[in-house]
C-alpha cells in the first residue's frame, strides 16, 4: 500500500533562495522534456521516452545532478502514461462524451514556472525534524527544518518538493510503501483485515453526498449540503472579485488563483472527512467490498441551468470521492468497485421494474405498482449493490434512512 506524508518546510532566507533556484531548474527540466514529447505526439510519432530523457539528461545533469533529472523525466512519463490510459478508455466508450483527455501540461502559472523538485530515495534522509537533501548537482547539499508528524512507517520512496502559492509555503511530499500507520496514539498495521464479508452499494449525489445500502439491510445517508454551501460561498466571492478585475481590464491575478485554490481545499477537506467516517462505519458493519455507481455524462449536461451545472461540475466531485474511497478503503482491506449507475434510480427495489417519473419530488421515489415511497438515493444505492450482489436483504425501513 503506497501513501505519502506531507510536511511543511521551514527554510531560512538563504535556504529558500537555494530551494527556489533548484525548484525552478526542476520546472525547466519538466517543461523541456514535456515539450519534446508533445512535439512527437502532435506530429503523429510514437512518444520515445528514452530518447527524450537522454536529450534533457545531457542538458541539465550538471545543474541538478543526473539522478534528479531522471526522477523528473520519469515523473513526466507517469503523466504521459496516464494520458494514454485515458485515451484508451475514451476509445472504448468508458468516459463521458464531453471528456477530452489532454497531454500533460507545462509547469506554468500566468507565464511563471511552477517550482518542482523530485528526488530519489537515496538523495534524502530524515533526522529528527530535519530534512537532509544531497546529490543536488551544483547545489550539492541542503538541510531544512520541517514542521509536521510522519505518521507512516515503511519503505521510503520518492520525495517531491513543491511551493504552495495559496499558502506561500514550501512543502515536501514523501512516498512510503506503508506497513504501519498512527491511528490515535497507536501504531497499527495496515492494511487491516476486513471484519466481515458483506458488500455495500453507494450512490453519489448532491444533497446526499453518499447514500449507502449494505446487503444485510443496514443503510445511512451522508450529508452533501455543507459541500454545496462551500461552493456557493466561494462562487459569490470569486464572481464579485472577478467583476472588479474585469472592470480594470485584467482577467486573472494571484489573488483570484488563491481564491480558487482555497475553495478546492475546503471542498476536499469536507470530502476527506466524510469518506473516512463512511469507510470506518462500513468496516465496523463488516463490509469487505464497496460498489460505487458512477453517473456517466452527467457532469457536463448542457441542458441544465447554470445553477445546476455549477453543482454538478464544481460540487459534485465524483472523481475525488471515488479516489478517496479507494484510498481509505484500502487501509481497511476493503475493495472498491465502480459500476455504471444507469437505470438504478428508476428501478423499484420491491417490484423490480423500471418506472419513468418514479422520482416524483426531490429525494423521494414512489413505485406506481406498489404505492410504496422510499428515499430516492437509497433506492439508487440498493440497485447499484444489486449489480454486484444478487441476494440482498430487502429492508423497507432501511430505504427510509435518515442522515447518519
What spans do the regions from the language model cover?
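Stable alpha-helical structural segments in soluble proteins, enriched in small hydrophobic residues
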Residues: 33, 71-83, 378-388, 392
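Acidic carboxylate diad motif detector
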Residues: 49-166, 315
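Generic detection of short hydrophobic beta-strand segments and adjacent strand-loop junctions
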Residues: 5-9, 139-150, 220-225
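Short coil/turn segments at secondary-structure boundaries
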Residues: 35, 39, 45-46, 87-101, ...
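Positively charged, helix-rich recognition surfaces that bind polyanionic ligands
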Residues: 3-4, 17, 168-404
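Surface-exposed helix-capping loop/turn segments at secondary-structure junctions
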Residues: 38-42, 84-92, 284-288, 331-336
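Gly/serine-rich nucleotide phosphate-binding loop at the start of the catalytic core
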Residues: 1-71
Amino acid at each position: 500500500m503506497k501513501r505519502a506524508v506531507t510536511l511543511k518546510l521551514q527554510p531560512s532566507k538563504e535556504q529558500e533562495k537555494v530551494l527556489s533556484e533548484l525548484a525552478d531548474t526542476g520546472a525547466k527540466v519538466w517543461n523541456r522534456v514535456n515539450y519534446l514529447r508533445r512535439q512527437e505526439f502532435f506530429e503523429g510519432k510514437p512518444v520515445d521516452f528514452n530518447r527524450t530523457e537522454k536529450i534533457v539528461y545531457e542538458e541539465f545533469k550538471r545543474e541538478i545532478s543526473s539522478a534528479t533529472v531522471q526522477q523528473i523525466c520519469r515523473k513526466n512519463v507517469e503523466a504521459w502514461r496516464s494520458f494514454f490510459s485515458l485515451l484508451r478508455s475514451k476509445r472504448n466508450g468508458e468516459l463521458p462524451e464531453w471528456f477530452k483527455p489532454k497531454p500533460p501540461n507545462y509547469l506554468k502559472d500566468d507565464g511563471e514556472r511552477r517550482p518542482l523538485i523530485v528526488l530519489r530515495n537515496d538523495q534524502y534522509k530524515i533526522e529528527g525534524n530535519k530534512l537532509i537533501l544531497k546529490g543536488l548537482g551544483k547545489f550539492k547539499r541542503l538541510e531544512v527544518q520541517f514542521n509536521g508528524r510522519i505518521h507512516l512507517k515503511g519503505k521510503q520512496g520518492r520525495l517531491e518538493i513543491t511551493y504552495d502559492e495559496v499558502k506561500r509555503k514550501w512543502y515536501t511530499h514523501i512516498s512510503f510503501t506503508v506497513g504501519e500507520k498512527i491511528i490515535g496514539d497507536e501504531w497499527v498495521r495496515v492494511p487491516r483485515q476486513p471484519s466481515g464479508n458483506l458488500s455495500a452499494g453507494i450512490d453519489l449525489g448532491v444533497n446526499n453526498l453518499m447514500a449507502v445500502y449494505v446487503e444485510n439491510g443496514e443503510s445511512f445517508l451522508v450529508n452533501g449540503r455543507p459541500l454545496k454551501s462551500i461552493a456557493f460561498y466561494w462562487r459569490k466571492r470569486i464572481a464579485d472579485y472577478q467583476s472588479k478585475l474585469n472592470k480594470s481590464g485584467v482577467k486573472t491575478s494571484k489573488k483570484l488563483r488563491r481564491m480558487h485554490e482555497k475553495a478546492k481545499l475546503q471542498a476536499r477537506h469536507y470530502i476527506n472527512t466524510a469518506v473516512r467516517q463512511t469507510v470506518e462505519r462500513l468496516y465496523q458493519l463488516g463490509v469487505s467490498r464497496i460498489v460505487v455507481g458512477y453517473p456517466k455524462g452527467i457532469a457536463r449536461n448542457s441542458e441544465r441551468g447554470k445553477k445546476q451545472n455549477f453543482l454538478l461540475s464544481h460540487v459534485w466531485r465524483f472523481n475525488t470521492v471515488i479516489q478517496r474511497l479507494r484510498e481509505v478503503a484500502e487501509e481497511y482491506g476493503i475493495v472498491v468497485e465502480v459500476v455504471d449507475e444507469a437505470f438504478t434510480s428508476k428501478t423499484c427495489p420491491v417490484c423490480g421494474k423500471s418506472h419513468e417519473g418514479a422520482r416524483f419530488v426531490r429525494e423521494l421515489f414512489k413505485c406506481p405498482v406498489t404505492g410504496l415511497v422510499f428515499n430516492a438515493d437509497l433506492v439508487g444505492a440498493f440497485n447499484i449493490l444489486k449489480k454486484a450482489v444478487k441476494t440482498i436483504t430487502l429492508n423497507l425501513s432501511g430505504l427510509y434512512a435518515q442522515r447518519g
